[in-house]
């Protein structure tokens, strides 16, 4: 059963108003601001926001094996305190456009290049406190080559059948949100094509 919460009509589409913003941290990958805002409800609030230049995620699909296979990376993530299976991804450098960043990240981390690219999703990583927009690209027509990961990246790369990756999501073996988004998107596309035959 769905529940609907009614909002006051005058506040429904209004935004919070920024009263002040102070940078409290600046590092090589992101900065943090402490913002004072006036919420649409009229309440003053402090919001600590991680400011990020944005990221790209690559759903690299090999369609030459009968069933689609997706390229996943396994690497240790200190914040999660564990190894995670993930789609290739990375930060957009300042001044860089998302598509060139996606092509660069796929080649650096996996060695693969792709002939066909399409942006399929655009979403926020964790909008409660992180200002990081992510663009998810579908990459097809893959060609293998040498990887050039950064010095601090130890990445194991492997193709998984889409069916297996979807099971990994449902079992919690894939626990990374951007990867879950990509796997579910491709699973839905495959189901839609199957139904329309």
What are these regions (language model features)?
Residues 6-26:
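Extended interaction-bearing regions that mediate binding to partners or small molecules
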Residues 20-59, 65:
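Acidic, metal-coordinating catalytic segment for phosphate/diphosphate chemistry
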Residues 31-35, 83, 133-135:
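Short beta-strand micro-motifs in enzyme catalytic cores
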Residues 166-197:
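Long hydrophobic alpha-helical segments typical of transmembrane helices together
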Residues 8-9, 13-15, 66-104, 108, ...:
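Conserved Nudix-box catalytic region and its N-terminal flanking loop in Nudix hydrolases
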Residues 45, 54-57, 91-177:
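Unchanged
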Residues 41, 62-65, 76, 140-144, ...:
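Short loop segments at secondary-structure junctions
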């Amino acid at each position: 059963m769905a529940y609907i919460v009614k909002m006051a009509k005058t506040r429904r589409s209004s935004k919070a108003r920024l009263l002040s913003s102070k940078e409290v941290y600046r590092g090589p990958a992101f900065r943090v601001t402490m913002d004072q805002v006036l919420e649409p409800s009229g309440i003053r609030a402090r919001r600590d926001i991680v400011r990020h230049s944005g990221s790209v995620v690559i759903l690299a699909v090999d369609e030459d094996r009968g069933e689609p296979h997706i390229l996943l990376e396994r690497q240790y993530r200190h914040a999660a305190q564990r190894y995670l299976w993930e789609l290739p991804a990375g930060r957009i450098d300042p001044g860089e456009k998302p598509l060139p960043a996606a092509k660069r990240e796929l080649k650096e981390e996996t060695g693969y290049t792709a002939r066909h690219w399409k942006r399929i999703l655009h979403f926020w990583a964790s909008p409660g406190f992180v200002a990081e927009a992510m663009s998810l690209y579908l990459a097809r027509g893959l060609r293998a080559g040498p990887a050039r990961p950064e010095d601090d990246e130890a990445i194991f790369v492997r193709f998984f059948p889409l069916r297996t990756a979807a099971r990994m999501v449902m079992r919690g073996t894939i626990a990374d949100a951007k990867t879950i988004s990509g796997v579910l998107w491709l699973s839905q596309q495959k189901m839609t094509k199957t139904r329309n035959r």
